[in-house]
């Protein structure tokens, strides 16, 4: 019984850490870097490009619905989008190696209405980062002004304050 408990604990720990630590490949953008070129087709049929996001204020969110930290921050992001999009802030929700069907199911189950780009690979993600989701970039006029990951745990207030600084 003890061996089963230890084995089960290890399996759970490995699963939880999989959204945080992965093999390191890809860019490592920092505050002050320029939003890279990319094109993503969103779930509503629209297209988002790096060039579009280099104009004005934007928030780029990389996520997977299986990641516990992403699940914690997505309600904040829905609220931020509802509040700041009318002020001209653009939002791009881009999955990291997750297909449309599982995202759509998660969105429906949680009442989200955010357009997303389902990326079955890590190509767009790796233009920005090598590891860790959630990963949120708040940018103004093409420059990354703030980067948020899962550590420390993200609050709505922190994210809103970073957007406020960019729109003032």
Task: Please report, for each region that a protein language model flagged, where it lies by residue.
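Thiol-/selenol-based redox modules, centered on thioredoxin-like
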Residues: 138-168
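Short active-site neighborhood of thiol/selenol oxidoreductases, capturing the structured segment around
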Residues: 50-71, 77
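Short, internal strand/loop/helix patches
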Residues: 107-141
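N-terminal "domain-start" segment that seeds a small globular fold
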Residues: 20-50
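Sec-dependent N-terminal signal peptides
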Residues: 4-13
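C-terminal motif of bacterial Sec signal peptides marking the signal peptidase cleavage site
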Residues: 15-18
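Hydrophobic beta-strand anchors of alpha/beta hydrolase catalytic cores
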Residues: 59-60, 91, 136
């Amino acid at each position: 019984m003890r061996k089963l408990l230890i084995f089960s604990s290890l399996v759970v720990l490995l699963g939880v850490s999989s959204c945080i630590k992965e093999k390191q490949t890809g860019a490592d953008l920092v505050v002050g870097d320029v939003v890279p070129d990319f094109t993503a087709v969103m779930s509503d049929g629209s297209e988002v490009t790096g060039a579009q996001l280099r104009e004005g204020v934007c928030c780029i969110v990389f996520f997977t619905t299986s990641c516990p930290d992403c699940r914690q921050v997505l309600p904040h992001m829905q609220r931020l989008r509802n509040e700041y999009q009318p002020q001209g802030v653009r939002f791009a929700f881009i999955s990291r190696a997750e297909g449309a069907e599982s995202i759509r199911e998660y969105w429906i189950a949680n009442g989200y209405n955010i357009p997303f780009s389902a990326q079955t690979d890590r190509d767009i993600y790796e233009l920005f980062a090598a590891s860790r989701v959630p990963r949120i970039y708040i940018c103004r006029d093409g420059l990354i002004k703030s980067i948020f990951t899962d550590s420390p745990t993200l609050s709505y207030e922190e994210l809103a304050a970073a957007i406020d600084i960019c729109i003032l």
